[in-house]
Regions:
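N-terminal loops that bind phosphate or other acidic moieties
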Residues: 2-5, 12, 16, 20-375
């Protein structure tokens, strides 16, 4: 069982070549262009087996649909989602200077160190589900080069203040997407069959709310929530900040919108969704920020939607709207609003149970039980 990245805890953070000037492991365009369709034959075989198991048809409810969905995603009538990989992307946001969060921007770097020490909620949940956890610094204001075990794949030191400037340049948003692609490729190379995406970045609910409004046409009032727990006065201020960001314009494409309003870790999660879908790897989506990142990925490649499973419904105001935009039905609703991939990690055992049920339950014929489907 491991809750730390693969780097040795006694060595400094591992540093990848700059994504702006090095050969890419996989180019963004190749991942967008090679997302496969769902395997309908694998779904058919899984569904037929589900109906032959020693239970009334459909009696395991959404677990049965989940099992069939995972078969279609993976192309295997008896799918597996173990081992899981949890990837937490961390970056700072210039919009934190607008006082939109209950916590100072310095908390991003402090939480990255906490992840590396194994002390955060996601570390606990990763240990519980025996998942590999990797923390990637894609743009923390203070580089994590002295934090053992953190992967450095930095694009820049924090995003721009979206209230008055773009978050990133077009090249930087592409580089951040490719950070996510590389992270998923590392996870798959290590054997991961399911990817859970998490994030850390003070003020990232502000950027996510702006992105959601831009993608859906909703107003700031409709998408903005309390994030880390802000009071009414700061909530009203946060809405005004997002309205200012939206007034600058959002561009014509999903890449333009990410560059204008997004965040480095949000773009990295979107890239991770692209890479996972390209490799037939299910993505267990976490809360509000992760769902907005997933929405961004589907605006670049609609086929990504087929590979998304929604772990939970967050308590953040805009999450319901983000789920609605994706037609997502979350597995859990626990009033969570932490991020880090925590809610998705809590939902992961449901995916594992769906797979185990499909492969390990006896059929009516095997068990000698009457009442099964006719031959």
């Amino acid at each position: 069982m491991r809750d730390q990245p693969s780097s040795s805890s006694s060595t400094p953070a591992s540093t990848l070549d700059s994504p702006l000037d090095s050969p890419l492991v996989s180019t963004l365009s190749s991942n967008i262009g090679r997302i496969p369709s769902l395997d309908l034959e694998a779904r058919r075989q899984a569904s037929a087996r589900l109906d032959s198991l020693t239970k009334p048809p459909g009696s395991l409810g959404r677990l049965e649909k989940l099992a069939a969905d995972l078969a279609a995603m993976t192309g295997d009538p008896l799918p597996r989602v173990d081992p899981a990989a949890i990837i937490v992307f961390a970056a700072d946001h210039g919009v934190a200077a607008e006082d939109v969060s209950a916590f100072p921007a310095s908390v991003t770097a402090q939480m990255v160190a906490n992840f590396a020490r194994g002390g955060a909620a996601i570390n606990v949940f990763a240990r519980q589900i025996n998942a590999r956890l990797e923390v990637v610094d894609v743009g923390v204001a203070t580089p994590s080069d002295q934090v053992p075990g953190v992967v450095l794949d930095r694009v820049r030191a924090g995003s721009g203040n979206i209230a008055c400037e773009d978050a990133m340049s077009p090249d930087e948003v592409k580089a951040a997407l490719e950070v996510g692609i590389r992270a998923v490729e590392r996870a798959r190379a290590a054997g991961a069959r399911c990817v859970i995406l998490g994030e850390m970045g003070i003020a990232n609910t502000t950027a996510s709310s702006a992105l959601l409004a831009a993608f859906t046409g909703l107003s700031a009032e409709e998408v903005v929530g309390r994030g880390t727990g802000i009071d009414d006065a700061r909530l009203d201020h946060k809405r005004k900040v997002i309205a200012r960001a939206l007034a600058r314009g959002t561009g014509d494409t999903a890449l333009d919108t990410l560059a204008s309003l997004g965040g480095l870790e949000i773009a990295a999660m979107a890239g991770a969704c692209l890479a996972a879908a390209a490799g037939r790897t299910p993505v267990l989506v976490d809360g509000f920020i992760a769902t907005v990142a997933a929405l961004a990925s589907t605006r670049m490649a609609p086929g990504v939607r087929d590979y998304l499973v929604f772990g939970h419904r967050s308590d953040e105001a805009g999450h319901g709207e983000a789920l609605a935009a994706l037609g997502g039905e979350p597995l859990l609703s626990l009033g969570l609003r932490l991020g880090e991939g925590s809610g998705a990690a809590l939902a992961y055992p449901l995916l594992a149970s769906a797979c185990a049920m499909l492969s390990e339950m006896a059929t009516f014929a095997d068990a000698g039980v009457e009442g099964g489907p006719s031959a």
